[in-house]
Design a protein with these regions (language model features):
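Alpha-helical transmembrane segments
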Residues: 71-77
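A generic alpha-helix surface/boundary motif
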Residues: 75, 88, 119-120, 150, ...
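Alpha-helical transmembrane segments of multi-pass membrane proteins
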Residues: 78-88
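Structural signal for the C-terminal ends of transmembrane alpha-helices
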Residues: 84, 126-131
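Interfacial/capping segments of alpha-helical transmembrane domains
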Residues: 87-97
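Flexible, solvent-exposed coil segments and beta strand-coil junctions
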Residues: 97-102, 186-188
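Interfacial helix-start motif at the membrane-water boundary
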Residues: 101-121
Length: 306
């Protein structure tokens, strides 16, 4: 029809189009009778500790206005708590009348050295080798969050040089609450100046927030894990291992790092679910033909999906 409408000069260019149409139809007929074999979906690669590390690290600091505001609040809140004597008053109060005994404080201190990493380690190892990709991703999110959180907290501890609170029964006060040493050249492993921010608190909040970010639809997670993390933070104050401002800073840092990385791992996992169809273990090219028409004539568009 187009040939007659556009004149006989257009007849020859249309011939390859009609030949291509016949060839496509023939291929479709042959393919319909070909044995398919065992059709399966290619399993997407499972996420691990280093997946999206650099982009997650960047998002942690300036990925959103909320994150930026949280980081700004860390030194601001510390300054307010220190200069209004809240640190000294709270630690003095728990030194005079502790909520629980020393053995409980010691339990939290020792357990906090590894407790935050246990659930994520179990999920990752099981999910990566035997379970689902989602389970592995949930575990990897927490492990990466703990690693990033640990590096940040260690750097801040080294830079701030803050001593631990020590209650003086003679004066009835907890001194050195305003003491920081920002001269990193004077810092050392055995200096005892490693209190700001609280690593135990930040690790627990990073664990909780990573779960929260990865499983936002599980409403029980924030109501269970955040209070448990807060309990760890209070134990650090009750045992005079940390000042109140140490715990507040640690909780803020852990929450920002954990939730950001957990949320990003959920997005990365969702992106890996677009798998490629396979037949007998070999990828199959999915394609289709679409007719096109314009003022210049007719044609066929061949689209391939792989």
């Amino acid at each position: 029809v187009s040939a007659w409408r556009n004149g006989m000069n257009n007849a020859l260019p249309l011939a390859p189009v009609f030949s291509l149409t016949a060839l496509v139809k023939a291929c479709q007929v042959v393919a319909s009778y070909a044995p398919l074999g065992n059709t399966s979906a290619a399993a997407p690669a499972k996420l691990h500790f280093f997946s999206g590390l650099w982009s997650n690290l960047a998002d942690t600091f300036w990925g959103s206005p909320a994150n930026i505001a949280a980081w700004v609040s860390v030194p601001v809140a510390t300054s307010i708590i220190v200069n209004t004597n809240i640190d000294e008053r709270v630690n003095t109060a728990v030194s005079r009348n502790p909520v629980w005994g020393r053995s409980t404080d010691t339990f939290f201190l020792q357990t906090g050295n590894f407790a935050a990493a246990v659930p994520h380690s179990i999920l990752f190892v099981y999910g990566y080798f035997w379970g689902s990709g989602e389970t592995a991703a949930a575990g990897a999110a927490g492990l990466q969050a703990l690693g990033v959180n640990g590096a940040i907290v260690f750097g801040l501890k080294w830079a701030s040089g803050r001593p631990r609170p020590v209650y003086d029964a003679t004066t009835g006060t907890t001194q050195r609450d305003k003491e920081f040493n920002f001269n990193i050249a004077e810092q050392s492993i055995d200096s005892g100046r490693w209190r700001w921010p609280s690593g135990h608190t930040s690790s627990m909040f990073a664990m909780a927030a990573a779960f929260h970010g990865f499983y936002p639809d599980k409403t029980w997670i924030p109501f269970v894990l955040y209070p448990l993390s807060g309990l760890m933070g209070f134990a650090m104050i009750n045992g005079n291992y940390h000042w109140t401002s140490d715990v507040v800073a640690g909780a803020t840092i852990g929450t920002v790092v954990g939730f950001t990385i957990g949320r990003n791992f959920r997005r990365m996992y969702a992106g890996t679910q677009k798998s490629v169809t396979k037949i007998d273990g070999k990828p199959v090219l999915d394609w289709y033909v679409t007719p096109r028409q314009s003022e210049q004539g007719m044609a066929l568009a061949l689209t391939a999906l792989f």
